[in-house]
């Protein structure tokens, strides 16, 4: 994750990222609203009528970050996974800006 709020001045602000179930299904109006070095905070979008999902401790979620350069730069390659979490490809990282 990144502290970059790339969507803050856009028509729709997605905080630090959109929250999904482990299978990649978006959770309506659930956003990553704050990030720290070791954790993040997820909340419903202000004014949302969506129902808060029943997420329990230990449930796996995915975040669609609005910016991930710092995270991506920490890895030599990226694992591409399918909907069963099986690695289907490995992408080498392009170095340099």
Predicted segments, located by residue:
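Active-site anion/phosphate-binding pocket segments in diverse small-molecule metabolic enzymes
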Residues: 1-97
């Amino acid at each position: 994750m990144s502290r970059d709020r790339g969507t803050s001045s856009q028509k729709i602000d997605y905080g630090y990222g959109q929250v999904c179930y482990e299978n990649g299904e978006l959770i309506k109006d659930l956003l990553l609203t704050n990030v720290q070095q070791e954790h993040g905070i997820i909340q419903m979008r202000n004014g949302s009528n969506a129902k808060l999902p029943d997420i329990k401790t230990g449930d796996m979620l995915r975040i669609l970050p609005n910016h991930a350069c710092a995270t991506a730069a920490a890895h030599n390659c990226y694992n591409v996974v399918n909907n069963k979490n099986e690695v289907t490809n490995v992408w080498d990282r392009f170095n340099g800006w």
